[in-house]
């Protein structure tokens, strides 16, 4: 039987999953995206060249990797076509290697209009979405009025589905959100054109995955966002609209629990968050700004500055538990170079008591005060180090402490953005 590894974020997203997926895709059978949409921004740096992927799996830069988009992903036709065109212009063959589930829902123009209008109306209480229609597309999926890849090849059915959806959404847009309606004919024509474009890539992704496992091939499941943004397990309502945890890999790709052999959780050596929502260890000071500047903490999809803070072990332990994480990958260790001291949150003060468990609601998280353990920093440069013994003693001690506090071994350490700036302590596929 083949080996399957799930790579997912163990914080609030932006942990560096794309680089690690690319690193692990050597001699891979396939890489599959299973949730989210083009709100993801996976940045790869190979030989100094930077590539940002939003929808297409990060394995696309490996010539022999099959890339799959599962039924759990919501697809923007315009974003997908743009990303394919950019990659192929740079010499990367995409369409012959990309397979898309016909059950994947589409992000339609009215989803984008709804997303942006709602955020404007919410004002200071906005969730902080990317405004790209992700949430409304998932809403339609659950409400059974979504339009899927498969529907594009049945014009009469598509017309009926689209008219029904627009009757509903245009009423909300014009009467409640006080914005413009979305035009039926333009939307219909664009959908038909995309149907022709995507037809050669439409495939039974679940079937492909089952066959690859029987053939003994390696498969990597690439998560987007992070576990603490999960619609069920995150800081609701400040969450994304899909299951970013390991269960999302099963449902969003169409495989059983026995198809997963290893879960790799990606976490920065500190913590970041984009948009609204609780963040107990946030540093709204010059230390936080310094981390932001050194770590280039600006969104790959939106360019928004990320909120920065100390490592939160309480939150990380929750991610480890709900995902059954087998091993951790700690990224951006080099960003902490030169800091005199480091802090790690090991517990919260909540309702007058100390707890090592995170609350289950956003308001509870907001009321938590972090309890810190302090560690000495290091003055040496760790950028690009690929050997554990070459790390400064204080950096090694910091990592070993994270490992012990989280109750999970560290399998990989990343010391820079390039594919080669990595040390693999234990290969997840070994």
From Swiss-Prot:
Pathway: Purine metabolism; AMP biosynthesis via de novo pathway; AMP from IMP: step 1/2. It comes from the Bacteria. Mg(2+) binds at residues 14, 41. IMP binds at residues 14-17, 39-42, 130, 144, 225, 240, 304. The active site is at 14 (proton acceptor), 42 (proton donor). The keyword Magnesium applies. It is found in: Cytoplasm. GO terms for cellular component: cytoplasm. SUPFAM superfamilies: P-loop containing nucleoside triphosphate hydrolases (SSF52540). It holds the Pfam family Adenylsucc_synt. It catalyses: IMP + L-aspartate + GTP = N(6)-(1,2-dicarboxyethyl)-AMP + GDP + phosphate + 2 H(+). One of its GO terms (molecular function) is magnesium ion binding. Its cofactor is Mg(2+). Keywords: Cytoplasm, GTP-binding, Ligase, Magnesium, Metal-binding, Nucleotide-binding, Purine biosynthesis. Belongs to the adenylosuccinate synthetase family. NCBIfam families: PRK01117.1 (NF002223), purA (TIGR00184). Plays an important role in the de novo pathway of purine nucleotide biosynthesis. Catalyzes the first committed step in the biosynthesis of AMP from IMP. This is Adenylosuccinate synthetase. Its EC number is 6.3.4.4. It comes from Stenotrophomonas maltophilia (strain R551-3). GO terms for biological process: 'de novo' AMP biosynthetic process; IMP metabolic process. SMART domains: Adenylsucc_synt (SM00788). PROSITE patterns: ADENYLOSUCCIN_SYN_1, ADENYLOSUCCIN_SYN_2. Binds 1 Mg(2+) ion per subunit. GTP binds at residues 13-19, 41-43, 306, 332-334, 414-416.
